[in-house]
UniProtKB/Swiss-Prot annotation:
This is Large ribosomal subunit protein uL2. InterPro entries: NA-bd_OB-fold, Rib_uL2_dom2, Ribosomal_uL2, Ribosomal_uL2_bac/org-type, Ribosomal_uL2_C, Ribosomal_uL2_CS, Ribosomal_uL2_dom3, Ribosomal_uL2_RNA-bd_dom. The gene is rplB. Keywords: Ribonucleoprotein, Ribosomal protein, RNA-binding, rRNA-binding. It comes from Clostridium acetobutylicum (strain ATCC 824 / DSM 792 / JCM 1419 / IAM 19013 / LMG 5710 / NBRC 13948 / NRRL B-527 / VKM B-1787 / 2291 / W). The keyword Ribosomal protein applies. NCBIfam families: rplB_bact (TIGR01171).
């Protein structure tokens, strides 16, 4: 996987880079695994904006991804590696021996023609999914479940991977991409390997228009708003905040203020926070 630049025909074009998509084998998705995806533009069921800076963008179909990998013991052959507009990782279309088709998150070095399988007896091979208790310590994994049978929730982004550090009783200790060390039940499943599209993080968007295609709208500074729109707004010219520190549009402290709940269930499962030295 690589990125490429462009001739500097404009200031934005000078900086812009794109993926070369060398691993992609087709641009025609499997029709039976597509569903409509309505653009909510950051609104909830009452029509109120709950997430700012969302709206517009390209209209996409959602690809149904198999995060559970619960079809045990049935080998599946990789037929295509595809681009998914709804996530940073690539996806792979696999066809099981009984004819069923599913999409999975494509790991790095998974190729068309490879065979993947899931279940407790699966080999330690890239793309295979099995319970953590059956995975050797030190193995690099992704698509990690937080609750057995619920489906993968951790380590799904492009280029990410976790490492199995230890097993202690009913729990396994993982080192996550953020550096956080946490416990996960050993019955939870994970997939062997690293998520595909390793160079995703070095792509330079280059211009605002590409962000608009992604459905992301501009972010306006509070200091240039009116005082009825933002606590930083108002005043003549470039005015200071006028408070002890910067705040959000709703008056809560911004920049470094901890928003995590004090008594969250997972506190006892986190051995080391991502920002601990």
């Amino acid at each position: 996987m690589a990125v490429r630049g462009f001739k500097p025909t404009s200031p934005a074009r000078r900086q812009m880079t794109v993926s070369t998509f060398e691993e992609i084998t087709t641009d025609v998705p499997e029709k039976s695994l597509l569903v409509s995806l309505n653009n909510k533009a950051g609104r909830n069921n009452n029509g109120k904006i709950t997430v700012r800076h969302r709206g517009g963008g390209n209209r996409n179909k959602y690809r149904l991804i198999d995060f559970k990998r619960n079809k045990d013991g049935v080998p599946a052959k990789v037929t295509t590696i595809e681009y998914d507009p709804n996530r940073s990782a690539y996806i792979a279309l696999v066809v099981y021996a009984d004819g069923e088709k599913r999409y999975i998150i494509a790991p790095t070095k998974l190729s068309v023609g490879d065979t993947v399988v899931s279940g407790p007896d699966a080999d330690i091979k890239i793309g295979n999914a099995l319970p953590i208790k059956n995975i050797p310590v030190g193995t690099v994994i992704h698509n990690v479940e937080l609750a057995a049978g619920k489906g993968a929730q951790l380590v799904r982004a492009a280029g990410s991977s976790a490492q199995l550090m230890a097993k202690e009783g009913n729990y396994a200790q993982l080192r996550l991409p953020s550096g956080e060390m946490r416990y996960v039940r050993i019955e939870c499943r994970a997939t062997i390997g690293t998520v595909s599209n390793l160079t995703h993080d070095i792509v330079n968007i280059g211009k605002a228009g590409r962000k608009r295609h992604m459905g992301i709208r501009p972010t306006v500074r509070g200091s240039v708003m009116n005082p009825n729109d933002h606590p930083h707004g108002g005043g003549e010219g470039k005015s200071p905040v006028g408070r002890p520190g910067p705040v959000t549009p709703w008056g809560k402290p911004a920049l470094g203020y901890k928003t995590r709940k004090n008594k969250k269930y997972s506190d006892k499962l986190i051995v080391k926070r991502r920002n601990d030295k």
